[in-house]
Design a protein with these regions (language model features):
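Basic/aromatic-rich interaction segments and small domains that mediate binding to polyanionic partners
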Residues: 2-65, 70
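Predominantly soluble domains enriched in secretory-pathway, periplasmic, or organellar proteins
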Residues: 74
Length: 74
């Protein structure tokens, strides 16, 4: 189960938000017992790139053996 403040991985591109599949965000609000989430995506320096409402199928939990990959945001 994904809870508030958990890190999640985006499963699809959201070009209108400048986000790509694999970007990592923080859940700031859980909707309808996990049917959807409000997720904040930030730069590594903490600047907010986007806060988006996503369906549960759009994100997944981070795995214990994953590593974050940095990319520039245009």
């Amino acid at each position: 189960m994904i809870d508030e403040l958990d890190l999640v991985v985006l499963k699809r591109d959201l070009p209108e938000e400048r986000l790509t599949a694999g970007d990592v965000g923080t859940v700031v609000l859980v909707h309808q017992q996990g049917a959807g989430y409000e997720v904040e995506f930030t730069t590594l320096s903490g600047d907010t790139v986007a806060v988006v409402t996503l369906d549960a199928t759009d994100v997944r939990s981070v795995a214990p053996r994953e590593i974050v990959h940095a990319r520039a945001v245009s």
